[in-house]
Amino acid sequence: MSDRKVILKMVMSLDGFATSPDGTHEWMFEWFGDDSGEWNRHALEEAGVHAMGRRSYEIMGPHWAASEGPIATAMNEKPKAVFSHTLEKAEWGPAEIFGGDLRAEIADLKAREDEGTVLVHGGPDFAKSLTRLGLVDEFQLTTVPVAIGAGHSPFAELGEHLKLDVVEEERFRSGALAQILVPKR
């Protein structure tokens, strides 16, 4: 039986937000460069399936479907697991829609004999749901050096402290800091 790792990959502001109050995230893009692109490409290539909520799927689909290059290839060709109670059809594929019990469905994805990780692309609400349930095995967080003052955090309202160990970090030329963290168990 397989036990694939669930990795939550997100970019966050210095003050801990993944999106602005209106749900936008354009403030993060100026901090991306060749070195951070390589970091991201590696995680995408290791993925066996991209997991995301409906909003992320609807935002990412048109962008990546119209893009080219190694990152676009990794995003477009690998299967997507879309978690939604309202999405009826997933056109950016290959994709499978999950709308039931989150804990059971993540366990199903982890147990599949497919290769690679379950790479979760936030939104903050989906990320928060996974984190609250203790379903994330590894966090790959890139913090960009900008404070946005308010927004949506994947770590808001967890109910208890989430203690993490930093197992790797890399600083990019732009000043962004990527960290791999695992929950203390």
Positions of the model-derived regions?
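Enzymes that bind and transform nitrogen-containing heteroaromatic metabolites
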Residues: 1-185
